[in-house]
Amino acid sequence: MCYSVNPKAVYLLEEFSSFAFFENMRNNYGLFLDSLEKLFEIYVHNLTYDLRSLPYPEQADIQWRETVLLNLRNTMDRIESAYAKIKTGDFTYLRCTGEIRSNDKGLSEFSPHWMDDLPTDKVKQCWDYYSIAKSYASIISNTYPTYWNIDELVIDYPEADIFHEINLVLPDSYPIYRVNPEIIVKSNENVGKTGIYICEEDRNRIEFMAASEEEGRGVEVL
């Protein structure tokens, strides 16, 4: 049986699942958290005298220190652990990006108004870091452990909203990719080799799959 695949789709999938792409996400999240913690230190050193008269949810020094910042730091720790695993070649840890995407819900439950009187440029830079980290995390989450429609990659990139304005510099000519029909993964089987796979039943589906030496990881569920 003859197999072919669009080189732009493969190239983008290689980029989205790469260590460098994950590292960009991790670095921006780290910059966000460091910036946020510095802003919080400025805030707690200039607390208003009537802070304790405010409703408890508005006492940001307690709410953010004991809940928000703690949760964000725990997320950073898990990202760092995944980063170390991915660096050794275990790309099943890409799925930790869901941690960042879940931060939005937690952040939405706490008021950010304590930042209102802090340096505007520093506050903006802080949230810019977060926005970039989220954009990378979203693309990675849409790459693993799931799949892309080839048309999304070939036709819609980079304009579609799903790519969050992450516009990679594409090469003038793409590498030559060849499909190895001898490497096959069936549903609920362990992935034996990390790489990019095409679906035999749906040729418009392309997927990055990751192998792992750890038990229970790298299982393909279709």
Predicted features and spans:
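Long, low-complexity, charged/polar intrinsically disordered regions
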Residues: 3-193, 198-200, 209, 215-216
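Non-catalytic accessory regions
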Residues: 204, 210-212, 218-222
